[in-house]
Every structure is written in C-alpha cells, then in structure tokens.
A protein has these predicted regions:
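FIC/Doc superfamily catalytic core
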Residues: 1-382, 390, 414-430
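Acidic, low-complexity, intrinsically disordered interaction modules
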Residues: 386-410
C-alpha cells in the first residue's frame, strides 16, 4: 500500500524527540550564517546569492539527469541580477527559462502559491513540450497514471504509483491551501513536509522534483524573512541521490510516520548550510585580501586574473596558467607574477622548485601558529578542511578538490592552505 492510499494520508506524524535537536542545530546554523553575512556589503551579498543560485539550478537539474552548462547558468543569473560577469557565456533558451523560474520564486516568495504559478513554472522547464525526446503534458496537471520506475525496458521495477489523475486536482487544492497557511510547526519541518507531500502527489508529468525543491526553499525563505538565498538543499541531495530516493521510497510505502524522512531532510539541510558557510568564507577571504592590498598598484590583467583565483578558479598559479588566463605570452606572465611577488601579493610555494607555482598571500603572517589539529576529511566525494582556531573555534570549510589533493601529496603547504581558506578569521578575531 502506498502512503496516499491511506485514509487522511496527509495527517503526517513524527517523533519530536528524534528531530528536536536537529531542528535546533539547523536553526542555529542558519542564524549564524546570516549573522556572518552582516560582514558583507550589498554587492558581495548579491554575488554570494548568485553563486548559490547557480549551484542550485545546476544541481537540481542534475538530480533529474539533466546536465546544464554552469557558466551559462552563472551568466544568466548575473545578467538578471545586474552583476558584472567577466566570463560571460551566452545562455541557451532552456537555461534562461529555468533561471527565470528560480528568480521568479525568489522575488515573489511572500505571495500565495497558486495552481497557475505552478503550471507556469513547470511549463518553463519544458519550453519545447518534450522531455528526453518524448512529448509530455506541460502547463497543466497530468491526465494519466504516473509510475515511478527504474531498470531497463521490460524489466522495470515500480518504486511508486502516484494518485490517480482524477484525484490530482483535489489533492493539489488541499496542498496549496496548506502551503499558504501560517505554519503550525517549525518552518524547517514544514519545508520537509512540503517536499514529501508534493512529490508524493506527483501532479505533473515531469519536473516534480525540481518544483518540490523550489517550494521547500520558498518556505525556508518565508521563515528567514529574507529574499537573499545563500543556501540550498539541491547540491546535498545530488551528492546523496541514492539515499534520497531510498528514504523517499521507504516513506511513500509507510504508514504516515515521516520521522525518518524528516531526520534525513534536516541533516541534509544542515549540510547545505555548512556548504554555504564555506562560500561566504571565500567571499570574506576575498574581501579581506583586497582590503589589505587596496594600495597595491596592479594592471587590469593582474587584477582580473587575481579575481579569477580568488573566486575559486581551480588550477595552480603558474606562469603557464597565468598566460592562458591573461591571453598573454609566458614571458609577460612571468613578469606579472614576479611583480606581484615583489609586492607581497603572491609568494613562491616551494622556492627553487623546477616548475615554480605560487600562492596568494591573504595575510603575510604565518597563520599556522593560530590553528591546531588541522586535517582533511573526505565525505561523499567532497573534501573538507577541519581545524581549530585559537584552541576554541572549530572550523570546517569545503575545499577545492585540487587543493585537497595537492595538500595530501605535499604539493601545497599547510600555511598556504590555511591562508586561502581561513585568513578571514584574522579580520574577525574571537
């Protein structure tokens, strides 16, 4: 029996004792994140949100097996938000449509949800009326049975059968009415319920997962009372896709007890906020760098390339990379780099190496004395820097894969690693 076949199936219940501590932790982390954002000016906040939205759009689509060009998405979002983008990539019509849905949801997050809005968003996901080469119903609720299956043709496994099409209109009316009411429980719990409830109705022929994640974000935005969105759950779901579908299937076959689902959902939300903290830290580091180097004279090319690396461009700083990014000769690149070394902006990572590479000097002080128990941890293919600042503040920052691999091979010093990911702490001592 599927969950929707039970009488009063949306009277979900759960064990508060199992999730109360998680709700408190999630709320505290969200509060700390927004507190940290007070250190950012408006332009930097906008850039942080743009980067978060870029990851959200790309990862949410990837969950459904759709690969989008990250630079196209980033360029589209930057244009809509009025942000200068040095690496503009003309977005496709499809990317533009998907981005507009996300921005529309953010801009109007306080407005009541309607059937018309949902149908408009779903239609924007499929501007040609096709999905995976097959025609689908767009801009309206589905009119046929919906089976969630996996496996090859002829040997499919049915994971879930959604409510019959003649029931969808009424089921969605109940959902929308509930969605628009003031929450009777924690907004974090409400967000998790909305996600589960919507995908269990599966009102559209395609696009339900992406819409469910947007609806979850809207409820969190209402709770935060903030149109700036700095965290999203899509990337974490994509990293743990098997767990996501497993817990979803388990709950949809259950008796209405959604404790396991909420536990998984809130833990995933917490992880997404931790990732957002890393992005904010990167922006704070960049701001800290430019404040320290405000009086340093650089050419336009030097400034542009430095900003690329400060924004997370994943490559070693070498004369070869510099020449490629600056569209200049290797000799010019060497002169650029040596000039910045002389000015204390860059330093040679391992002096005397046959193929020299360089590190950005965020803070000229050797930060290693301020940190202890520094290590790298891998979790679901993502690397994190774990360290303790001044013996009392635990730090956990997501690393670029290249930095993690270089550090573990001894090709990146601990000083450079801490400088790149933790220098912002020196500007905000505790």
């Amino acid at each position: 029996m599927y969950i929707h076949e039970r009488e009063n199936w949306t009277d979900f219940h759960w064990e508060n004792s199992a999730i109360d501590a998680l709700i408190e932790l999630a709320s505290r982390k969200i509060g700390l994140l927004y507190g940290r954002l007070n250190n950012l000016g408006f332009d930097n906040k906008l850039r942080a949100m743009a980067e978060n939205l870029t990851h959200d759009v790309v990862q949410s689509s990837e969950i459904e097996g759709i690969s989008l060009n990250t630079e196209e998405v980033r360029s589209s979002i930057a244009r809509h938000l009025g942000i200068d983008n040095l690496k503009y990539t003309a977005p496709s019509h499809y990317v533009e449509s998907v981005v507009k849905v996300m921005l529309d949801a953010i801009e109007h997050y306080m407005q009541p949800l309607t059937k018309e809005t949902l149908c408009r968003w779903q239609s924007a996901f499929f501007p040609t009326g096709f999905s995976d080469g097959f025609p689908i119903e767009v801009g309206c609720y589905r009119t046929h049975e919906e089976h969630i299956v996996s496996g090859i043709f002829g040997k499919e496994r049915i994971h879930y059968i959604a409510p019959a099409p003649q029931l969808v209109e009424n089921e969605m009316a109940n959902f929308i009415q509930w969605f628009n009411q003031p929450p009777s429980t924690s907004s974090i719990v409400q967000s998790g319920i909305a996600h589960l409830w919507f995908v269990s109705i599966h009102p559209f022929e395609d696009g339900n997962g992406r819409l469910a994640r947007i609806l979850s974000d809207i409820l969190l935005a209402k709770s935060d009372k903030n149109e700036f969105r700095f965290y999203n759950i899509s990337a974490e779901i994509n990293r743990n896709k098997k767990q996501y579908y497993s817990i979803l299937e388990q709950t949809q076959h259950g008796n209405g007890d959604i404790t396991s689902w909420l536990t998984w959902y809130i833990k995933t939300l917490i992880a997404s906020v931790e990732d957002a903290e890393t992005s904010v830290n990167s922006i704070l580091n960049k701001s800290f760098f430019w404040q320290r180097n405000a009086s340093v004279i650089m050419t336009d090319r030097q400034t542009q390339i430095m900003n690329m690396f400060l924004d997370g461009y994943e490559a070693k700083i070498t004369s070869k990379t510099w020449a490629a990014l600056g569209n200049c000769s290797k000799d010019t690149a060497i002169r650029d780099i040596q000039d910045l070394v002389a000015k204390g902006v860059l330093r040679e990572e391992f002096p005397g190496a046959k193929r020299p590479c360089y590190a950005i000097v965020y803070d000229p002080e050797d930060l290693t004395s301020w940190f202890s128990d520094t290590q790298i941890e891998e979790e679901n293919g993502t690397f994190y820097l774990l360290t303790t600042y001044k013996g009392k503040q635990n730090v956990r920052n997501r690393l670029l894969r290249l930095d993690a691999e270089r550090y573990m091979k001894g090709d990146l010093s601990q000083q450079s690693l801490l400088n790149k990911y933790c220098a912002y702490l020196m500007d905000n001592p505790k």
